[in-house]
Design a protein with these regions (language model features):
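The feature marks the mature, well-folded catalytic cores of soluble enzymes
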Residues: 1-179
Length: 179
């Protein structure tokens, strides 16, 4: 945000070597770099976040993030609102995605609430109600899937202003039409 890049501390120790490579690349871009401290219990993975700049909202999962890792990122981004969504996927993006309008503002969200905790589902609907936006509910097969069948990961998306790039169509074609 505004020339700031945050280098996270992955939960998987073998992935932490990536940080040195990423830092070298970012230094050439002349960005301000904030590195997550190497503190016990502080972890965060990129797939566990969606930052929506226009609304200044950070969505975070807690599967591979820790609460103190999420707080570090939220503080560094100076967000107006933090929405934590816990679910059964291995990253937030396996069961949730925001949708942005052409101006870059959140205009709806897509979520597999069947994979979310009750508290997270309530937090999501409270957030959506505060913006008066729809929540498009999808089944597990459009997300990470079930124990017996892998999903199509349609919700694992890249939300861009006016466009949602996702690997598969949603099983309900009306969702793709409406977003």
């Amino acid at each position: 945000q505004n020339g700031l890049a945050i280098i996270l501390r992955a939960g998987e120790p073998q992935r932490r070597i990536e940080n040195r490579l990423v830092k070298r690349c970012l230094e050439h871009l002349e960005l301000e770099i904030a590195e997550m401290p190497d503190k016990a219990g502080m972890r965060a993975d990129g797939g566990e976040f969606y930052f929506c700049k226009k609304n200044n909202v950070l969505f975070s999962g807690l599967k591979r993030n820790t609460s103190i890792g999420v707080e570090f990122v939220a503080e560094r981004l100076n967000v107006n609102e933090l929405v934590i969504l816990e679910g059964e996927g291995f990253h937030l993006d396996t069961f949730f995605t925001p949708v942005l309008n052409k101006s870059g503002c959140i205009c709806s969200v897509v979520a597999c609430t069947a994979l979310m905790t009750t508290e997270s589902k309530n937090a999501l609907y409270k957030f959506a109600d505060s913006l008066d936006i729809p929540v498009f509910e999808i089944p597990p097969n459009d997300a990470i899937g079930t124990k017996s069948k892998v999903g199509n990961f349609a919700t694992n998306a890249l939300p861009l202003p006016g466009t949602l790039i996702h690997p598969s169509p949603f099983s309900n074609p009306d969702i793709d039409k409406k977003i």
